[in-house]
A protein has these predicted regions:
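A short beta-strand-loop structural module common to alpha/beta enzyme folds
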Residues: 42-51
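Extracytoplasmic/periplasmic, Sec-exported soluble proteins
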Residues: 47-48, 59, 86-90
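Short conserved loop adjoining the S-adenosyl-L-methionine
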Residues: 55
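Structural micro-motif
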Residues: 59-69
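Local sequence-structure signature of Cys/Sec-based thiol-disulfide redox active-site neighborhoods
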Residues: 15-43
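Short, glycine/charged-enriched secondary-structure capping and boundary segments
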Residues: 34-37, 60-61, 82-83
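Sec-dependent N-terminal signal peptides
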Residues: 3-14
Length: 101
């Protein structure tokens, strides 16, 4: 049921708000992005491609972890993991994009 709820959240456009989607794989969970619990002014959703394979295709995920920022239901920025399967992006960079700075 949890996977279905997550899929429905990502299937519907998010209007009038920001949504930050963090996508990873279960085998790479130790490399979840460290800033997820820190960013503000956005809803945060987490998903794992091994539990929700449709996410990989729908959002064209080629590397994990991946962060996707949506505003008014449209993707405005994407950050993808590097070859070491870690996401090297500063919290301030993500927060500035959320806040339109």
């Amino acid at each position: 049921m949890r996977n279905l709820i997550f899929f429905l959240l990502l299937s519907a456009p998010v209007y009038g708000q920001n949504a930050l989607v963090h996508i990873n794989a279960g085998f790479n969970k130790s490399n979840d992005w460290y800033g997820i619990g820190v960013v503000t002014n956005t809803k945060v959703y987490n998903g794992y491609i091994d539990n929700n394979p449709a996410i990989k295709e729908k959002y064209n995920i080629s590397r994990v972890p991946t962060l996707i920022l949506f505003k008014e239901g449209q993707e405005v920025k994407r950050w993808e993991g590097s070859l070491d399967m870690k996401l090297h992006v500063k919290i301030s960079e993500v927060q500035n994009k959320i806040d339109d700075k």
